[in-house]
């Protein structure tokens, strides 16, 4: 008598775990005993599915702490090393990141970093240039005028709601020196932090007399008693009263322009505003620096945009361009600039070269 054919028992997903599982060696299952997972049991009635409550209790979700993890960028989930950026050939090398010294200007240079178009790298440019100059031995102050406080975060300064800073200086006539804090990014770098409280300042300033001069008075009083070679005013992506205060307080404008389509969008309106401010409120104001950001050498568009910008601003545009860089994007999530996060990266070296050009131009123009 022939034995009946052996049929393979298949278990559908709704009936629990199958008895025989082929495991892909590249992925693998967690090393958990079968008993823990309550595999299906044979009975006269067929296969008894696992209890959902038992299965859930046996395989709890692993809680991942919030925030970035450095290992996430050092090695991906398949163990492949990250793609390294090629450092540009230029004025600086990685070994000279913190040792290069730059000439100090005879008078404080106050830059407003502005562009009406958002996403062009205003805050990134502000914090990295400030850090580059400070790491080169110069004294630098950064004033955060953006209610989002991204510049404050990128320089490693905590700023929960209620933290005294720019809002108190503008709205309560507080002394700027009372609220300036040291940044851990460089020994010579100080920050006037911004919080979400600053969001209401645009409306509150409307009813104040001489509202456009609030920051100028506070900054001049600070510089009389405290030394600073460079001051950077990081503005929100709009031409409101906060940006107007910065334009009145500054003597130079630094415009970051991304090397992408619509790159000059917003610059035309900014130039009109500059002319109005120069004519009525601040005759010392001038556009001195244009910095090309997010440059992708793989595309023709980036080169075309760079040529177009240099044609419009031949004297102001720096030779150095800031490349599109993963390291530059990652650094703020660690409360760092790219110069301390990855000092040998192309982005860090490019910002150092830009800072060197800015410092040398300042001395040459005075001479």
Would you name each region that the model predicts?
Residues 1-367:
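P-loop NTP-binding core
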């Amino acid at each position: 008598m022939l034995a009946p054919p052996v049929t393979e028992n298949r278990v559908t997903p709704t009936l629990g775990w199958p008895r025989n599982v082929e495991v892909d060696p590249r992925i693998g299952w967690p090393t958990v005993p079968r008993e823990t997972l309550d595999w299906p049991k044979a009975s006269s009635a067929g296969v008894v599915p696992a209890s959902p409550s038992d299965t859930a209790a046996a395989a709890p979700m692993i809680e991942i702490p919030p925030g970035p993890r450095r290992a996430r960028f050092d090695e991906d989930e398949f163990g492949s090393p990250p793609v390294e950026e090629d450092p540009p050939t230029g004025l600086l090398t990685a070994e000279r990141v913190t040792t290069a010294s730059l000439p100090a200007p005879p008078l404080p240079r106050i830059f407003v970093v502005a562009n009406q178009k958002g996403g062009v790298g205003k805050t990134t440019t502000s914090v990295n240039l400030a850090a580059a100059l400070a790491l080169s031995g110069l004294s630098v102050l950064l004033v955060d005028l953006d209610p989002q406080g991204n510049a404050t975060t990128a320089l490693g300064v905590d700023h929960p709601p209620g933290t005294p800073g720019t809002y108190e200086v503008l709205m309560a006539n507080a002394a700027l020196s009372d609220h300036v804090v040291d940044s851990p990014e460089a020994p010579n770098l100080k920050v006037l932090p911004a919080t979400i409280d600053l969001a209401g300042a645009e409306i509150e300033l409307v009813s104040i007399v001489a509202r456009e001069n609030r920051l100028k008075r506070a900054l001049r009083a600070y510089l009389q008693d405290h030394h600073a070679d460079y001051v950077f005013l990081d503005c929100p992506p709009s031409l409101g009263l906060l940006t107007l205060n910065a334009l009145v307080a500054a003597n130079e404008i630094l415009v970051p322009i991304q090397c992408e389509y619509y790159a000059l969008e917003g610059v035309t309106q900014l130039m009109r505003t500059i002319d109005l401010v120069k004519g009525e409120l601040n005759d010392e104001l001038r556009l001195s620096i244009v910095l090309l950001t997010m440059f992708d050498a793989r595309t023709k568009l980036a080169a075309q945009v760079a040529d177009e910008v240099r044609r419009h601003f031949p004297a102001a545009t720096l030779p150095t361009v800031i490349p599109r860089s993963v390291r530059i994007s990652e650094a703020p999530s660690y409360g760092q600039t790219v110069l301390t996060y990855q000092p040998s990266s192309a982005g860090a070296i490019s910002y150092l070269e830009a800072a060197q050009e800015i410092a040398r131009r300042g001395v040459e123009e005075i001479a």
